[in-house]
């Protein structure tokens, strides 16, 4: 099972809509500052496709990739409301392959932190730049080492009418890895609650490490 497979059906309900809207608007402002006009966009680690769909609705032609089949199922259902839906592709980031170059690439909501091995993030960067047009932009965010360290031995909860999610987080200074232990409870149609468990791992990449890997 890939990360977020069990969580996929409840993921959007646990995220505030405003986060996506603000992120899409911010990305569009950055696109306007690009050295080349941005019409085609790669969304790397797209999750349930909310950002990809918002950009599609703003007129961009979007190719969106993710490793979770369940996340992409949610994304495809969401994209049915788009006039020009994104193209969703089941791919891992280090094995990225596109049929043609794009004007811009994005990776949001700490997707790159899930690459815990140096060779994987280095290969991901190499492939992103391989499929970027000359002058194209690569825009991404990460959870910082400071944030992930602060999450050590913490407990977080998210709740909707039909789901309850508990996150327990632990940080290993030696490995620079933050482990998320996720218990998800979903209300079934018969009134019983169903429990799923997932474990996620994020690597704390420093600015210096990312700069070196990008060079």
Regions found by a protein language model. Give the residues of each.
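A short His-aromatic
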Residues: 113-115
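Conserved class I S-adenosyl-L-methionine
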Residues: 1-45
């Amino acid at each position: 099972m890939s990360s977020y497979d069990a969580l996929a059906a409840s993921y959007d309900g646990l995220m505030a809509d405003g986060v996506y809207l603000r992120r899409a608007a911010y990305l569009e402002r950055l696109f306007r500052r690009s050295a080349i006009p941005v019409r085609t966009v790669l969304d790397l680690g797209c999750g349930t496709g909310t950002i990809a769909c918002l950009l599609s609705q703003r007129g961009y032609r979007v190719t969106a990739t993710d490793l979770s089949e369940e996340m992409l199922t949610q994304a495809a259902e969401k994209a049915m409301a788009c006039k020009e839906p994104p193209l969703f592709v089941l791919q891992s980031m280090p094995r990225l392959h596109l049929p043609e170059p794009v004007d811009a690439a994005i990776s949001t909501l700490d997707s790159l932190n899930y690459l815990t091995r140096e060779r994987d993030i280095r290969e991901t960067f190499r492939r992103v730049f391989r499929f970027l047009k000359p002058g194209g932009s690569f825009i991404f965010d990460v959870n910082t080492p400071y944030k992930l360290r602060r999450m050590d031995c913490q407990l977080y909860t998210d709740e909707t009418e039909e789901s309850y999610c508990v996150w327990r987080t632990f940080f290993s200074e030696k490995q620079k890895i933050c482990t998320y232990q996720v218990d998800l409870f979903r209300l079934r149609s018969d009134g019983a609650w169903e429990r799923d468990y997932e474990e996620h791992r994020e690597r704390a990449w420093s600015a210096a490490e990312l700069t070196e890997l990008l060079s």
